[in-house]
């Protein structure tokens, strides 16, 4: 069956009793004209008579008045006389799959043709009164068409969760968890912050005491943990310019490095102490011993070794202390004499400044 678009020339005047032929069917086929409905009925009735009946007839009593049809669009008036529909019985049999598919395709094409009115129908509505009545009724959602006269059955309805803009109850909890901001750092007066500040200050003092710079620490950590550690990282940690999470992570690493550095420094100091010559403690000479040594120096500037031993025993001092004192005293005396000699030489050889003599004749009024 081929479907062609309706035109103004293809419509013929229908009788009043033939117009509502399929009004009792609650399906999309209710919009069809009498010729299309007759064709559809013939296709359904072509099923073999041996098949069992599945659906009983529907009885409906409808009363169509002229006032009801007057509520339609302006300009389309159909002179339909009030009528009372009698009981009609329609039998639907079991259709084969191929015949069911062909019937559905035919009905869909006819519905598409009926749903889109031709422009000539609107323009020539006055001349075609009574030829075709529009589908103005809302039928129950059951029957072959599965709905009203629209083409909504061609597209599956969207679920209400997609149409609604508000998220479902279960999704609201997930959205809150996803949009939850990260954990805020603790307050400035919290024990964690105070402990972190204390460790940063202690780390800086111990690092300086061990003789390491921030660059040394950064290079040592970068060799083990990667290139993300540098002098800038250590500086920001000591100045508490890192985030709380990063500072806590770096604190554990620096604490471990500091313990290892102190152990290595202790071993190094022990080795250096064994090889290094011990320096003697500075000796303090009392005032009475200094006066005795000064008297001995005035008597003899450079005493012999036996005299130094005798003076050391008398003053309860070591021999080396007395010997060093006489050496230092001679050097100081030499510096004093040199400075005095140089100052006297400058006073003798320095010329005196004399003012020039001016004669009275040289002065002009």
From Swiss-Prot:
Enumerate the InterPro entries for this protein. HD, Homeobox_CS, Homeodomain-like_sf, Lambda_DNA-bd_dom_sf, POU, POU_dom, POU_domain_TF
Family annotation (SMART domains): HOX (SM00389), POU (SM00352)
- Give GO terms for biological process: positive regulation of transcription by RNA polymerase II
Top-level taxon of the source organism: Eukaryota
Q: Which PROSITE patterns match?
A: HOMEOBOX_1, HOMEOBOX_2, POU_1, POU_2, POU_3
Query: Record's Pfam families?
Result: Homeodomain, Pou
Major subcellular location class: nucleus
The POU-specific domain, residue ranges:
188-262
What keywords does the record list, in alphabetical order?
Activator, DNA-binding, Homeobox, Nucleus, Transcription, Transcription regulation
**Compositional bias ranges of the Basic and acidic residues kind:** 173-183
One GO location term (cellular component): nucleus
Looking at the record, which segments are called Disordered?
A: 160-191
Say if the entry is tagged with keyword Oxidoreductase.
Answer: no
Subcellular location as annotated: Nucleus
DNA-binding region of this protein? 278-337
The Gene Ontology terms for molecular function here are:
DNA-binding transcription factor activity, RNA polymerase II-specific; RNA polymerase II cis-regulatory region sequence-specific DNA binding
Q: What does this protein do?
A: Transcription factor that activates growth hormone and prolactin genes. Specifically binds to the consensus sequence 5'-TAAAT-3'.
What does UniProt say about this protein's domains? Answer: The 9aaTAD motif is a transactivation domain present in a large number of yeast and animal transcription factors.
Similarity-based family: Belongs to the POU transcription factor family. Class-1 subfamily.
Q: Which PANTHER family match?
A: NETRIN-1-RELATED, POU DOMAIN
Put simply, this protein is called: Pituitary-specific positive transcription factor 1
Q: Which organism is it from?
A: Oncorhynchus keta
Lineage at the top is: Eukaryota, Metazoa, Chordata, Craniata, Vertebrata
């Amino acid at each position: 069956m081929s479907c062609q678009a309706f035109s103004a020339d293809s419509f013929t005047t229908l009788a009043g009793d033939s117009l509502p032929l399929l009004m009792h069917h609650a399906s999309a086929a209710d919009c069809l004209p009498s010729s299309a409905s007759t064709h559809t009925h013939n296709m359904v009735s072509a099923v073999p008579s041996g098949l069992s009946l599945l659906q009983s007839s529907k009885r409906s009593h409808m009363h169509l008045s002229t006032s009801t049809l007057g509520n339609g669009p302006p300009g389309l008036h159909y002179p339909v006389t009030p009528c009372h529909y009698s009981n009609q019985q329609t039998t639907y049999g079991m259709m084969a799959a191929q015949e069911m598919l062909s019937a559905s395709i035919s009905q869909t094409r006819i519905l598409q043709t009926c749903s889109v009115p031709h422009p000539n129908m609107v323009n020539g509505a006055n001349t075609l009164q009574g030829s075709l009545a529009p589908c103005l009724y809302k039928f129950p959602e059951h029957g072959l068409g599965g709905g009203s006269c629209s083409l909504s059955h061609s597209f599956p309805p969207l679920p209400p969760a997609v149409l609604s803009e508000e998220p479902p109850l279960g999704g609201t909890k997930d959205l809150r968890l996803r949009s939850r901001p990260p954990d805020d750092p603790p307050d400035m007066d919290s024990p964690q912050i105070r402990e972190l500040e204390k460790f940063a200050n202690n780390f800086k003092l111990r690092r300086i005491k061990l003789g390491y710079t921030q660059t040394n620490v950064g290079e040592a950590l970068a060799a083990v943990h990667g290139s993300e550690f540098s002098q800038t990282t250590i500086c920001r940690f000591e100045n508490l310019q890192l985030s709380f999470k990063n500072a806590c992570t770096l604190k554990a690493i620096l604490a471990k490095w500091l313990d290892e550095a102190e152990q290595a420094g202790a071993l190094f100091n022990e080795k250096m102490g064994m090889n290094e010559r011990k320096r003697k403690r500075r000796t303090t000479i009392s005032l009475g011993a200094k006066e005795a040594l000064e008297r001995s120096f005035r008597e003899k500037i450079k005493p012999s070794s036996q005299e130094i031993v005798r003076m050391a025993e008398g003053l309860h001092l070591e021999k080396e202390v007395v010997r060093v004192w006489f050496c230092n005293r001679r050097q100081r005396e030499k510096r004093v004499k040199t400075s005095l000699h140089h100052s006297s030489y400058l006073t003798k050889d320095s010329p005196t400044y004399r003012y020039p003599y001016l004669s009275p004749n040289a002065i002009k009024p």
